[in-house]
Amino acid sequence: MANYTPAPEDDYDVFIEDDLSDDEIEPCTPYDPKILSAQLVPYLYTTVFMVGLLDNILVVFILVKYKGLRQAENMSFLNLALSNLGFLLTLPFWAYAASHGEGFDDPLCKILLLLYSIGLYSEAFFNVLLTVQRYKEFFHVRRRFSACRTVAGSIFISVLVWVTATLVTLPELVSYKPQMQSQKYKCFFTGLHFLPADETFWKHFLTLKMNILGFLLPLFAFVYCYVRMRKTLQFRERNYGLFKLVFTIMAVFLLMWGPYNIVLFLSAFNEHFSLHGCGSSYNLNKSVQITRIIAATHCCVNPLLYVFLDKAFRKHLCHLFYLCSDTAPQPTEEPAQGASGEEYHLSS
């Protein structure tokens, strides 16, 4: 097994993957990620960065100026946009590293890993929070948690989620450090040598942590809440626009990050699935890189979903660019306690 693991500048896994240049058990040519990295990643990541930066800043502006942050869901939408922006800030650096074949020295190595990881985990957690908020609204349990729906309560929960996402990324932060390789710095996984466990254990631990917190937890929340809501007659009879938006955002997140998490799991535990042969290793390494590139583009998708599924957002966007002739909308007030999510959504 390799002593180090390349980080995203090799356009491989930021968390746990083995060095792709290692010799396999069978004599064969290993997969070289640098070919696809140099040809595709710089252009794709730069495009995603520019598009994502523009549309997520627009989301933040519209939420703050027009829709207001008095409703708990709007606060969560704002935090989702901030999560995307944090993730986006790392893409130009990975694009540069892919095109030049080199990484970064301290402290930039750890800063980029921190932004990348916090952006990913915080988006997963805020997606879960939004889903649970819609679930409680649907089954009219809002009054039991009325304190959580105040501005102060929403801010407290948001801070708690950000702190949790930061704490979750600490293992990556302490286990990565820049190393010199071929007279170039690389941001490598070196393991947690101050704890009594070998590198294989931490490789499996970090993989399972990402799979559980970044994929299985949102998947469970999505399936449980959606199935329970789908069974009720009210859900089938009424078209809840805000419900549709929240669950579509979660579904897209799962669809874009799901393949990467599955392939990552198979790659980390390949010895348990008889996937350590030459051909299997080659295909797994290639799949990890491709699915990771696809997943990294998710951070510019949410604002597009707002445009297609949120009438109020389209109206505010229209007024912002002077495409509408009627009077510009005013900032939205918090709905009354008895108002439904749909009534607020259509009037905001």
Swiss-Prot record:
Glycans are attached at N285. GO terms for molecular function: C-C chemokine binding; C-C chemokine receptor activity; CCR chemokine receptor binding. Coiled coil: none annotated. It is a multi-pass membrane protein. Residues 65-76, 132-150, 226-244, 314-348 are cytoplasmic. It comes from the Eukaryota. Belongs to the G-protein coupled receptor 1 family. Lacks the conserved DRYLAIV motif in the second intracellular loop that is required for signaling of functional chemokine receptors. This is Chemokine C-C motif receptor-like 2. The lineage of its organism: Eukaryota, Metazoa, Chordata, Craniata, Vertebrata.
